């Protein structure tokens, strides 16, 4: 359960703590599962009601109808992390499209070399060669979006 928490930055956990505390009116250390939807809505966090219900079921291990803070963070993190990764993929797709001038779904490794050099001017030619060799795993001399995405997200 704590895996998702590790992926959230401390400031995000702090925001979740404030929201949780505001809805934990009795200061019992837990909130009703009914309040989760309201908290996500107030935070401007998009969610699908059915997915939310399934996650509440999964996270509320003791089926108490209440979530402790850790359970709440685990649940909220699933929405936050998914949204962040979707946004990142969209941005990377746009960046890839800029370099894929012909629109054929790949960019030449020479273009990739320019991108890498812009990202880190300190790279030597040998380092660039090694990186490109690793990224262009199939040795095609081109990099498709999946290879590009893997490079950018590690």
From Swiss-Prot:
Annotated positions binding Ca(2+) 2: 136, 138, 140, 142, 147
Coiled coil (residue ranges): none
SMART domains: EFh (SM00054)
Protein keywords: Allergen, Calcium, Metal-binding, Muscle protein, Repeat
Pfam families: EF-hand_7
Recorded GO CC terms: myosin II complex
Family from the record: Belongs to the troponin C family.
Xref: InterPro entries: CALM/Myosin/TropC-like, EF-hand-dom_pair, EF_Hand_1_Ca_BS, EF_hand_dom
UniProt key word Repeat: yes
Organism annotation: Blattella germanica (German cockroach)
PROSITE patterns assigned: EF_HAND_1, EF_HAND_2
Annotated residues for binding of Ca(2+) 1: 60, 62, 64, 66, 71
Function statement: Troponin is the central regulatory protein of striated muscle contraction. It consists of three components: Troponin-I (Tn-I) which is the inhibitor of actomyosin ATPase, Troponin-T (Tn-T) which contains the binding site for tropomyosin and Troponin-C (Tn-C). The binding of calcium to Tn-C abolishes the inhibitory action of Tn on actin filaments.
EF-hand domain span: 11-46, 47-82, 87-122, 123-154
Stated name of the protein: Troponin C, isoallergen Bla g 6.0301
Source organism, top-level taxon: Eukaryota
A molecular function (GO) term: calcium ion binding
